[in-house]
């Protein structure tokens, strides 16, 4: 379960940011996670709660925005959201698309304080 190491990294980054800002506690952490990031959101939430114990993030809420897979279709000359991220085919014209625009994100977007 690599989600635990990801959770530890999130806690480290957020704790460092809190210390730098002179904040004693973080109440929420906002993440963006792409469908292709290979992260199971529920496992990350569970791991985050464990990793946050005894830190300024203890009890903080982990808010995850799931990012769909978006590819660029050269035939349609457009960015399209894939309905099935396992098939890299344009849902408009059914042509193969390999240029991923979104979907691999794993970003810490914001921290909230009480």
Curated annotation (Swiss-Prot):
It holds the Pfam family HypA. InterPro entries: Hydgase_Ni_incorp_HypA/HybF_CS, HypA/HybF. The keyword Zinc applies. GO terms for molecular function: nickel cation binding; zinc ion binding. Transmembrane segments: none annotated. Ni(2+) binds at residue 2. Zn(2+) binds at residues 73, 76, 90, 93. Keywords: Metal-binding, Nickel, Zinc. GO terms for biological process: protein maturation; protein modification process. Disulfide bonds: none annotated. The keyword Cell wall biogenesis/degradation does not apply. Involved in the maturation of [NiFe] hydrogenases. Required for nickel insertion into the metal center of the hydrogenase. Belongs to the HypA/HybF family. This is Hydrogenase maturation factor HypA. It comes from Chloroflexus aurantiacus (strain ATCC 29366 / DSM 635 / J-10-fl). The gene is hypA.
């Amino acid at each position: 379960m690599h989600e635990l190491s990801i959770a530890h990294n999130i806690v480290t980054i957020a704790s460092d940011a809190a210390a730098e800002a002179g904040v004693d506690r973080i109440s929420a952490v906002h993440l963006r996670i792409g469908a292709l990031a290979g992260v199971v959101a529920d496992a990350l939430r569970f791991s985050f709660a464990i990793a946050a114990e005894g830190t300024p993030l203890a009890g903080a809420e982990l808010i995850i925005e799931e990012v769909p897979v978006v590819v660029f279709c050269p035939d349609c000359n457009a960015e399209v959201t894939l309905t099935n991220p396992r098939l890299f085919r344009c849902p408009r014209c059914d042509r193969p698309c390999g240029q991923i625009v979104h979907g691999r994100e794993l970003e810490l977007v914001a921290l909230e304080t009480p």
